[in-house]
């Protein structure tokens, strides 16, 4: 699960308050903080967690396994859609993470986070375009079957215009992806 968003950080993801402190023996990081709206948080055994180290300007990224302990979850969020995934708040309370689980370099986490978000946006655009194609196809089929005043509604200019607009916008969306 991807653990970036925090209360009070919203769009300014780099301002998160979750902290990672190196243990005295230098063998592990202790992560403390709260993440919210974590997709698949209830199912995940592994978390990508973004946290600040000391007074660093940028986030660092860590691979955190649920088995490390110090992790607790709030109940499921009640959502209007996307019911197939678990969305929860995740709390890290002195979660001990081995030093080798620092992902990439220190302060490179924000760059990693943004790259993950950008990939997600591209995938979402593809899914939305697929939905648009299905709606166009279904609309054309319906317009050809639905009769009004003795002929299919697809023969009327207003319906043709609407179907043409749908097809044009869907093609434009696909071309932009």
Pin down the residues of each PLM region.
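Flexible loop/turn segments at secondary-structure boundaries
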Residues: 9-12, 38-39, 70-71, 99, ...
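Short, solvent-exposed loop/turn segments at the edges of secondary structure
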Residues: 13-15, 42-44, 56-57, 85-90, ...
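Short beta-strand or tight-loop elements
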Residues: 14-16, 45, 69, 159
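A structural signal for short hydrophobic beta-strand segments in well-ordered beta-sheet cores
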Residues: 18-21
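Glycine-rich beta->alpha junctions and the first turn(s) of the following alpha-helix
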Residues: 72-174
């Amino acid at each position: 699960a991807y653990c970036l968003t925090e209360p009070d950080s919203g769009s300014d993801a780099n301002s998160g308050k979750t902290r990672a402190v190196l243990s005295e023996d230098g063998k592990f990081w202790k992560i403390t903080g709260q993440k919210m709206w974590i997709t698949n948080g209830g199912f995940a055994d592994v978390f990508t967690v973004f946290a600040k180290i000391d007074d660093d300007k940028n986030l660092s990224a860590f691979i955190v396994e649920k088995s490390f302990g110090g992790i607790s979850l709030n109940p499921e969020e009640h959502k209007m859609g996307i019911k197939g995934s678990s969305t929860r708040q995740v709390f890290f309370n002195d979660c001990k993470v081995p030093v080798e689980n620092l992902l990439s370099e220190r302060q490179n986490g924000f760059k990693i986070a943004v790259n993950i978000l950008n990939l997600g946006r591209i995938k979402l655009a593809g899914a939305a375009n697929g939905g648009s194609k299905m709606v166009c196809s279904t609309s054309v089929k319906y317009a050809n079957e639905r009769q009004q005043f003795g002929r299919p509604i697809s023969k009327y200019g207003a319906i043709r215009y609407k179907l043409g607009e749908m097809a044009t916008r869907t093609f434009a969306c696909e071309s932009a992806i």
